[in-house]
Swiss-Prot record:
Homodimer. Residues 1-334 are annotated as: A. It comes from Vesicomyosocius okutanii subsp. Calyptogena okutanii (strain HA). Disulfide bonds: none annotated. This is Chaperone protein HtpG. GO terms for molecular function: ATP binding; ATP hydrolysis activity; ATP-dependent protein folding chaperone; unfolded protein binding. Molecular chaperone. Has ATPase activity. It holds the Pfam family HSP90. Residues 335-549 are annotated as: B. InterPro entries: HATPase_C_sf, Heat_shock_protein_90_CS, HSP90_C, Hsp90_fam, Hsp90_N, Ribosomal_Su5_D2-typ_SF. Keywords: ATP-binding, Chaperone, Cytoplasm, Nucleotide-binding, Stress response.
Length: 616
């Protein structure tokens, strides 16, 4: 490129800039945190790449971040001698947002949510926070290893367009030049900037340098502002909870302190240090398939990578922290890392340690565990299926609400359920539904409520998948009360009475079957109902109604099966059918059963007509 070219910002970038400028006015200082974080990443990348290509680092200059203030020009310049960017990378990374998850996030973000500056850092678009305090921003950069001494200059006022041109730049790395707005000159104050660095970036491992203030102002000498140490390498005996909380916040951009942390130094066959945090709040993008992981991997304090499932199983993706080992080759590729014996051993030990801490929390700090479960319970339900090695440990950490619970809060353990099981009960019973209210009001529960049998009410979006794969606990089978035949809790007298009733309804059932033949597989007398007239049941090995609805919502094909309609012979509506088979009433009984399990009618208007007709 030899001439300046002008481009328009991508729509999402313009939206982001608008949100930042108008919504982050109460926390403007975060611009420096974001730019220092980007500079630190650039230095870490150069360190890593230079391990396999020492020509990338020119000369013996220390890798640092410099912050320079020019009050006459109203500028702040943040310079790093990290990896730098090529012209192609500038075009790709600045002015556009390629990540689909980020685009989706921006589309849903409103101005109130945008006031949470940590969302900006978590999504990796923090550079644009520069425009909160600047009316013009310039980037001058040159890629490390580039044979040409030419660099790339990017410039914008943040008003819809930006320019790119080629310029001379003898050194590799990146400089970000902020032209500070007239009403933001407080950020040109040396003391103010040092305070911001101390607040947000003290634990950045790259030295952050500023000009040392001297009395004669003649000699320009730089001094390090941040501690620039590996926080996790410190002895935990020397650290206070406040220190951990501050490091956690600087690492994760979380405003809240973590629930707890695990700080361990392991020496033996494998030497490593791990500092892992369990957050108190779930990130908003926890269900994004391509979200970044929370564990950073270091080898001898050299940053290697993050966002690698080799470091932590998917169900523990909420865990944040650092793992640093001396027993890892520094030139491992991401692919090789997956099968590395050292990483596998560290991962196994870390998972065991995390589950142990959660177990102790549940026992000794139930309020903290209740907070954890509310935020991350669904992920633990993933884990009981995915982690076959630790399945039993995870199962003991699960919490549920039941038909005996006062509300939807999940507090009941499987151990508690078994302890209070009925004398002749052979299964752990559950029902799945789209909502807690639908589960709680399900007609399938009626006989269980009457006989004081506890039933798990499952309405989390992972529950159907969990019970399809997690089928027994402590030797006792988990069984849906909306599927197949149930064990009989009736007395001999009750059984005999029901058998007599069933015989009296044989002709009624035959006639009902003809009317509903295209909609149901079978009609039979129910052992589940005591108050409602009807309910739908699936065969033992077939998909239930709730699972069918979930699959349909995901656009998945489902097997062409029909449910079983169960009727309650003691209900007045069903008794009417013994006198006369009313086709409208039969169809209403079926539609009512569909609605009671949270389903949707194919023709609601026709249902209303039938109801009105029956009422009249």
């Amino acid at each position: 490129m030899t001439i300046k070219q002008t481009h328009s910002f991508q729509t999402e970038v313009s939206q982001l800039l608008h949100l930042m400028i108008h919504s982050l006015y109460s926390n403007k200082e975060i611009f420096l945190r974001e730019l220092i974080s980007n500079a630190s990443d650039a230095v870490d990348k150069l360190k890593f790449k230079s391990l396999s290509d020492d020509t990338l680092i020119e000369g013996k200059e220390a890798l640092q971040i410099h912050i320079d203030v020019n009050k006459d020009a109203n500028t702040i310049t943040i310079t790093d001698n990290g990896i730098g960017m090529s012209e192609v990378e500038v075009n790709k990374n600045i002015g556009t947002i390629a990540n689909s998850g980020t685009k989706k996030f921006l589309k849903s973000l409103n101005e109130t949510q945008a006031q949470d500056s940590n969302l900006i850092g978590q999504f990796g678009v923090g550079f644009y926070s520069s425009f909160i305090v600047s009316d013009k921003v310039e980037i001058i950069t040159r890629k490390a290893g580039s044979k040409s001494k030419k660099g790339t200059k990017w410039a914008s006022t943040g008003k819809g367009k930006y320019s790119i041109e080629s310029i001379d730049r003898p050194d590799f790395g990146t400089s970000v030049i902020l032209h500070i707005k007239k009403d933001e000159k407080e950020f040109l104050d040396d003391y103010r900037l040092r305070n911001i660095i101390s607040k947000y970036s003290d634990h950045i491992t790259v030295p952050i340098m500023m000009v040392k203030v001297s009395e004669d102002n003649k000699d320009i000498e730089y001094e390090r502002i941040n501690k620039a140490n590996a926080f996790w390498a410190q002895d935990k005996q020397d650290l206070k909870q406040k220190d951990y909380d501050e490091f956690y916040k600087s690492l994760t951009y979380d405003l809240e302190a973590p629930l707890t942390q695990l700080h361990n130094r392991v020496e033996g066959n494998i030497d490593y240090t791990s500092l892992l945090f369990i957050p108190s709040k779930s990130p908003f993008d926890i269900w994004e398939p391509k979200r970044k992981g929370g564990i950073k991997l270091y080898a001898k304090r050299v940053f290697i990578m993050e966002d690698n499932e080799a470091l932590m199983p998917l169900y523990l993706r909420f865990v944040k922290g650092v793992i640093d080992t001396a027993d890892l080759s520094l030139n491992l590729s991401r692919e090789i890392l997956q099968d590395n014996k050292v990483i596998k051993a560290i991962r196994k030990a870390s998972v065991k340690r995390i589950l142990s801490v959660l177990e102790k929390m549940a026992k000794n700090k139930p309020e903290d565990y209740a907070t954890f479960w509310q935020e991350f319970g669904m992920l633990m339900k993933e884990g009981v299926v995915e982690d076959t090695i630790n399945k039993d440990k995870i199962a003991k950490l699960l919490r549920f609400t039941t038909n005996k619970s006062k509300n939807a809060t999940q507090t009941v353990t499987l151990e508690h359920y078994i302890k209070n099981i009925q004398k002749d009960q052979k299964a752990i019973y559950y029902i799945t539904a789209e909502t807690y209210e639908t589960a709680k009001g399900s007609p399938h529960l009626e006989n269980f409520n009457q006989k004081n049998i506890e039933v798990l009410l499952l309405s989390d979006r992972v529950d159907e998948w969990m019970v399809s794969n997690f089928r027994e606990f402590d030797g006792i089978q988990l069984k849906s009360i909306a599927k197949g035949n149930l064990e009989d809790f009736d007395s001999k007298e009750e059984k005999k009475a029901k058998e007599e009733v069933a015989k009296n309804f044989e002709i009624v059932i035959e006639k009902m079957q003809k009317i509903l033949d295209s909609q149901v597989k079978e009609i039979k007398i129910s052992s589940r109902l005591s108050e409602s007239p009807s309910c739908l049941v699936a065969d033992e090995n077939e998909m239930g109604g709730n699972m069918e609805r979930i699959m349909k919502s995901l656009g998945q094909d489902i097997p062409d099966t029909k449910p079983i309609l169960e009727i309650n012979p003691t209900h007045s509506l069903v008794k009417k059918l013994k006198t006369k088979i009313d086709e409208d009433l039969v169809k209403v009984l079926f539609d009512q059963a569909v609605l009671s399990e949270g389903g949707q009618l194919k023709d609601p208007a026709e249902f209303v007509k039938r109801i009105n007709k029956l009422i009249n």
